Amino acid sequence: MTDVWLLFLLLLTLLAGFSCKTIEKHPYLTTQTPITLLSSNDGEINQVFLKTVEQTTDWNLTTKDSFTVIHLGPNHPPLIKTIYDTAPAFIMGTPSMGMSKDGRFGIIANHGWRPTEFKKLRLPPGPRTNADITPGMLNHEKFTAQHANVISLIDLSIENFPVVHRMLLEDFPIHVLSHPDGERFIVGASDYFYLFKIVDSKLVEINRSKHPHGMPEFWVTPNGNNLIATQAASRIPLLPGEAGEMMLPQIHWYAIEGDNIKHLSEVKISSHLNTEVLPETAILRVSNDGKMALICQRSNNSGKDFSDILIADLTLEEPEITSFIEDAADGIESFAFHPNGKMAVATGLGTYHNCIVVLDIASKPVRVLYTMDAKGISQGIEFTPDGEKLFVGSAITGRIEVFDVVGDYELRKNPKFLNVGFGHNSLTIGPRYNN
C-alpha cells in the first residue's frame, strides 16, 4: 500500500511540474524573441458602432485613425504606443500590411472607396481626397485626408514612429504585402498591381502592372512566384467617398515574373461542389507550403446564418476551388497558418457573439476542430514565428487578444491582452528592429 501511495504522490508531483511549465515565467506577456506588432486602426468603423445618449448611431466622426506599435520580447513588459492622425487606414481590405524584413519600416495603404453606410458619416473639415492635397501637405506630421488614395511609410526605429514618406496613387490601393524576397512590396489597387522598394526612407516605384479585374484582396505564395486575388470591379467609375456599383467578385491567379505581374487564369469552383462565390467573397490567405489558399466566402456578418470557407488547390496547373468547409462562422474575415503546417485559424465577424475557428489542415479533407469565443468583428490575425502565441485583433474593442498554443492543435485564451487604437483593422508582425 505504501508503494501505491508513493507512486500516487510521484504522479501528482510530475503533473504539478508539467502544469508549472505552462505558466508564464513573468507576470506579463513575453515572446521568445524580440518582435514588433503593427496594428492599423480605422476611426470610421469604430464610429459606426458608437451611440448617442438616445442610443442612435453617432454619425459625427470623432474617432481618429491611428496605428499602434507593440514591442514584445523575452524579458520586458509589452511596449505599446498609439499614434493618431498621421496615417489614414480604412477597414475595407485584407487585414494585413507590409513590414520590412528587418522590422524597421511599416507600410499602410488607404483608399477612398466607401460602402453606402459609411457615406452617412459626417467628417471633420479639412482635406479629404487626393484633389484637396498639396505637395507640401504630404510632408506634414499630421495627415487626416480620409478619402485619399495614399500609402504611408512609417519608421518603426524612431521613438515617435513618424510617417517618413507618403505617396498618392491615382487608383484605389486596397492592400499592401511584403514580397518573400524581403526587398520588394506589392500594392494591389483597383487598376494596377504596383511593386515598390524602400530607398533612403522613401518608397520608390519599381513597376506597375495593369489589370482589368477590379479591387484586389490578394496573397503571395511563399516562393514569391505567384499571387492569388479575389477581385471585384465596379460597373461605373470609382470616385472617392462613393460606393460604386460592384460586380460579383472573381478569383484570379497571377504570375510574378521579375517585376511584372501577369494574369494566368480564373480560379473557379469545381462543378461538383455545392457552394458559390457571393457578392461579399473577399479575403484570402495562402498556406505556408504554398499548396492551398483559404478564401472567405462572405467577409461580413449577417446575424442570421453562417458562411463557408472555400479551399483552392494551388498545386494544379490552373488552380481550382476543390473543397470547402460549410457553415464555418457568421462571416469570415482572415486566416493564420501555424508554423507546424497542421493548424490554421479563421476569424469570425460576429459583432456581439463572435468566434475564431480552429482548422486541421493536415487532414483530408480539411476539417473544423473547434471554435472559441473572441471579441467582436475580428480582423488581423498572426502567429508568432515560433508558433507559441496567436494574436487576434478586434475592430470594436480596442484590443488584440492573445492565445497560447499547446501542442499541435490546442489554443488557450490568455487573460492578458494588448490595447490598440479603436477601430483595429489590420495586423502585421515582424522582428524588432535592432540597429
Labelled PLM ranges:
Residues 7-17:
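Bacterial N-terminal signal peptides
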